[in-house]
From Swiss-Prot:
Classification of source organism: Bacteria, Pseudomonadati, Pseudomonadota, Gammaproteobacteria, Pasteurellales
Active site: 187 (thioimide intermediate), 194 (proton donor)
Subunit structure: Homodimer.
Positions of substrate binding: 86-88, 226-227
The protein's Enzyme Commission number: 1.7.1.13
Top-level EC class: oxidoreductase
Compartments (UniProt record): Cytoplasm
Keyword Disulfide bond: no
Gene Ontology CC entries for this record: cytoplasm
Source organism per UniProt: Actinobacillus pleuropneumoniae serotype 3 (strain JL03)
Transmembrane segments: none
The protein's name: NADPH-dependent 7-cyano-7-deazaguanine reductase
Amino acid sequence: MNYNDKSLSALKLGQKTEYKSEYDPTLLQPVPRKLNRDGLGITEQQPFDRGADVWTCYELSWLNENGLPQVAIADVAIDFRSENLIESKSFKLYLNSFNQTKFASLEQVEQALAKDLSQCASGQVSVKVYKLSAYTRQPIVDFAGECIDEQDIQIDSYEFSNEHLASVAEGEIVEETLVSHLLKSNCLITSQPDWGSVQIHYIGKKLNREKLLRYLVSFREHNEFHEQCVERIFTDLIQFTQPEKLTVYARYTRRGGLDINPFRSNFEAVPQNLRMARQ
């Protein structure tokens, strides 16, 4: 990745920022997906054909026509085929700009979000805004699958390497779902920690649990955005294991009132956005 690309140097991440409380869609900042996909060799043709960056926006407020504050939670899904991902701090600042702005209805807020986010992402974005009474009925869930975290192994290196996946696929063809809650990477710009859980559903040669866990732990000091980490995991698994079918889904903990949950697959649809215990 070109860390000197102007789209990265212009980001507000890590900079002192003025918080605006009047609606301002120009606060949104895009990051071209090709910056990371070029390095993975997947800009022209991605190994996944389904997916989205699913965001939960917990800090959404505006004024109704009488000036009374309103609060809600929004689910946002940015299609993986969009030209850009959306930088998270700019997303937060953009949401803050709704605070002192009057909107006629919740639906008008939803429409504004969809329009602005689609323009920034240069692609399809779906938005659903929920009243709190609707959202509180949603359960807290866990990833289905076998958790691979309780292995008695020694790890003394935390430098990212996909070589941990060498010979990771061995034995009979299986369909299974593996889960780890030990995914941790760092923000590409600020190096702040990003904590997440990852689910890998595949049909292919059975994966060696120890090698897979070592690979996932090697992200611990790795600097990339959430979406980029998931695409890297997907691409590495395709390269090293050549599965018949593959899904990689990560759910990251909240920062600044936002959580990001990238989903990539070559055979499954994007699931319902249900939060986990750490979210």
